[in-house]
């Protein structure tokens, strides 16, 4: 079954009663004031067709969803072994900002989608690029087909003001020899990436390359190889939703990536990319209503990688 606007709107109506049962991220002050009632879903087919319902054009802070794009950029700059000797490919089973395993495992983060792993990726970008923030924005604008996307300076500044834990993670990795650059410039880049403001439609278009073997919308050349696209989807399926990755795989059955801004992106390889947005989060930091909406959509259209 192919999603229709009516199907998507009906799913949003079904999950709307969940609003009020989660919690908007408040540890980043600039995000705490977001309306909890926002709810949207957008589907982008590999041919560029968009089907959407709800609040799909309003931009929000994508936060950890940006970790997929920063890893994509790193994959285009480094040989695989240069990346994977510094960050692992395993689920962590701990909170996204945990330091427990990092101490026990000699400063090597479990995967690139927890904070420690994303900071290593940001460190890699800082080592190889003269203007990493510019290159990241250039990539996202290209993938989304939207030249007007920007960083949210207020959100980035808010995160920098409350950066003690992320700085501690970076300094701990540096003490193990797994951080090449000065910590604060890398943190500045990292928070800028997280502050990207995008809509459901922007994100669905952006992630089309992972549904199409590395080929972005409207492009003639892949941005990562078919093999790398497959590997990225594997990582998203096992590590993309923090310590809720197993629950998401069980309920939704698609590779996915979440952010504490309330967005979740999911991939149906070979067919479509999907974005949902609902700012209230579950205890793992994933969108409560968004996960439920994706579960219903997967069931109704009969899609799963399992």
Swiss-Prot record:
One of its GO terms (molecular function) is glutaminase activity. It comes from the Bacteria. It catalyses: L-glutamine + H2O = L-glutamate + NH4(+). This is Glutaminase. Belongs to the glutaminase family. The gene is glsA. Homotetramer. One of its GO terms (biological process) is glutamate biosynthetic process. Keywords: Hydrolase. NCBIfam families: Gln_ase, PRK00971.1-1, PRK00971.1-2. Substrate binds at residues 64, 115, 159, 166, 190, 242, 260. Gene3D superfamilies: DD-peptidase/beta-lactamase superfamily (3.40.710.10).
